[in-house]
A protein has these predicted regions:
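A fold-wide structural signal in alpha/beta-hydrolase
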Residues: 6-8, 103, 206
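Alpha-helical metal-binding/catalytic segments enriched in His/Glu/Asp
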Residues: 1-19, 141
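His/Asp/Glu-rich mid-to-C-terminal helical/loop segments that flank catalytic regions of hydrolases
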Residues: 5, 115-164
Length: 220
């Protein structure tokens, strides 16, 4: 099937050192950014792709794009999570694009793999791959690329970012990357193997305080 728009497969180096490769690309290609419908980063280990966040303005297009993924395998369900803005602070290469106003997404992944020992280390070897998860995830990615590429227009950027830029506490500098999707101060979703997951945080939990400071909104 030939898509209506170009689909690019891109590999980045220097993510762990500060998103060096993706930042360099967006800096060197500013004239292309307004033409990019969306960026999807697959870099979360061997578990199966299980979902994405969706803003209200994107929801209709995303329901069209992801209906095939939702019907792909009942044992590996896929869902869209309604959010006020695309979460930031995960620390992967889609954030280089979000910072320049391009919709960027990091897949939610679920499954039986314990990725913390291997991912992004010298222990990240082929024996950690789970074939059925990889086959499912690559199929979801292919369907997504084709679906977004065949939309009538670009994916909406209206209300794309979380209020205040959606950055993690502490601004662009310090602070730990929790790895959560927020609705207000409530955790809508917790990314597996993230700092939040390791701390025992779960979807539905509400952030009330950080240290001795009360949290009333995402800008607190």
């Amino acid at each position: 099937a030939k898509p209506r728009r170009t689909i690019r497969f891109m590999l980045w180096s220097g993510e762990e050192q500060g998103l060096l490769g993706s930042k360099a690309w967006v800096d060197q290609n500013p004239e292309l950014l307004d033409k990019i419908s969306a960026v999807f980063v697959y870099d979360g280990g061997p578990n199966a792709i299980a979902g994405l966040p969706a803003t209200a303005a994107m929801k209709e297009d995303f329901e069209t794009v992801f209906t095939p993924a939702m019907n792909l395998n009942p044992d590996l369900p896929f869902k869209l999570t309604d959010v006020d803005g695309i979460p930031r602070g995960i620390g992967s290469d889609h954030e280089s694009f979000l910072a320049r106003g391009v919709p960027g997404f990091f897949w939610t992944q679920e499954g039986r793999a314990d990725t913390w020992h291997g991912i992004h280390t010298q222990f990240d070897t082929f024996d950690l791959v789970i074939p059925e998860y990889l086959e499912h995830s690559t199929t979801v990615i292919a369907l997504t690329a084709l679906g977004v590429g065949n939309l009538d227009g670009l994916l909406s950027r209206e209300g794309m970012l979380e209020e205040g830029g959606g950055r993690r506490r502490g601004g662009g500098g310090g602070g730990r990357r929790l790895g959560v999707m927020l609705e207000g101060t409530t955790l809508a979703e917790v990314i597996p193997d993230s700092t939040a997951a390791k701390a025992g945080m779960k979807a539905g939990d509400k952030i009330l305080k950080i240290g001795d400071e009360e949290v009333t909104d995402r800008r607190s």
